[in-house]
Amino acid sequence: MSSSRPEPGPWAPLSPRLQPLSQSSSSLLGEGREQRPELRKTASSTVWQAQLGEASTRPQAPEEEGNPPESMKPARASGPKARPSAGGHWWSSTVGNVSTMGGSDLCRLRAPSAAAMQRSHSDLVRSTQMRGHSGARKASLSCSALGSSPVHRAQLQPGGTSGQGGQAPAGLERDLAPEDETSNSAWMLGASQLSVPPLDLGDTTAHSSSAQAEPKAAEQLATTTCHALPPAALLCGMREVRAGGCCHALPATGILAFPKLVASVSESGLQAQHGVKIHCRLSGGLPGHSHCCAHLWGPAGLVPEPGSRTKDVWTMTSANDLAPAEASPLSAQDAGVQAAPVAACKAVATSPSLEAPAALHVFPEVTLGSSLEEVPSPVRDVRWDAEGMTWEVYGAAVDLEVLGVAIQKHLEMQFEQLQRAPASEDSLSVEGRRGPLRAVMQSLRRPSCCGCSGAAPE
């Protein structure tokens, strides 16, 4: 006689005994043949119900009849109690994500007309427990349902048992418990029925995270496992990846794989800056099955491959974009800012020009305080006329001190120019002044009219 015990979840209800809940609550529980009517899902609950016909008529093991297992005992006060029954039932809720089923009806559902499985897009976790002759092995099936149709019907058949040295089919194994417990993970997707025959792996060993399942004794039966056709997705836990283990994925035929949706940064794990690097290779023992090994890498252990560029998933920026440019400096066009050339500044017309800085910064700088070294002069340009007597100041306030300095510099410059002039220019200027006077005096002494009249023939 087998019974089911729901695994206590982090949000398990703290009720001393099992009580029926209304449809507005977080979960609905259907049990027995009397409660077989088809129930429709609410916003946060799902009911799975299986028939108990064949389970009650099957013979039971004598060891189990004599000594009921520990799962028959009432559960703790922290979780809901499980009632012993000849068959099994499925119970799923979004709060606990716990599904239980009897050992005799392991992974077997009726036709869609008998029990309709209606669920939301939330993850549905189903766990089964079965006691053996000499040891206990626990197999849990974790299914993540993602699809366009809210109603998915699947019919799973129990796999066959192996003989001496037999081992449970390890198509999807992960999270081995210390008590030699094997768990299988699968993704179920689709609106049609899925029927998967049992897999016989033979001597194929399954890679697991903690330990491998050792062969049982000759008289021990291996646990019955269920295999569904999952999408081509890798179902590994972070605990298995940290241990450096490998998990196996079964290829899907005609099933569209949807990525898992994440709602927050903490759920996606981007703030931890951890990633999973997956290497897949085809195995020789299983044709059509790929062995995928996942390795965990962090910020310290990241070794980029040659020719590859790693970018942050959240900001989509690489480390080279944020690092200072060493090989190729950034230009103004890369940043999208057109930097105008800095013109040479002059305090006054006679002062030496200030050289522009050698390198222009790409982005504009904002300075709140004025530095004492780069104080601009209030006088930008001083223009003098030709005589040097009038002046105009542009772009500066009229200040007596500034004007006095400008006039003094202008007079000093003119004095230096007069001293540099050679003395020959002075002599030439004196001779140039005397030349016209001498020409006038000579013309007066010798009148041309008289000379011309006397010299002219009659």
UniProtKB/Swiss-Prot annotation:
Disordered: region residues: 1-94, 118-172
Record text on subunit structure and interactions: Interacts with activated forms of GNAO1 and GNAZ.
Compositional bias segments (type: Low complexity): 14-30
One GO cellular component term: plasma membrane
Residue ranges with Basic and acidic residues bias: 31-41
Organism: Homo sapiens
Stored InterPro entries: GPRIN2-like/GPRIN3, GRIN_C
UniProt xrefs under Pfam families: GRIN_C
Tissues where the protein occurs: Expressed specifically in the cerebellum.
Biological process terms in GO annotation: neuron projection development
Name of the protein in its database record: G protein-regulated inducer of neurite outgrowth 2
PANTHER family: G PROTEIN-REGULATED INDUCER OF NEURITE OUTGROWTH 2, G PROTEIN-REGULATED INDUCER OF NEURITE OUTGROWTH C-TERMINAL DOMAIN-CONTAINING PROTEIN
Purpose: May be involved in neurite outgrowth.
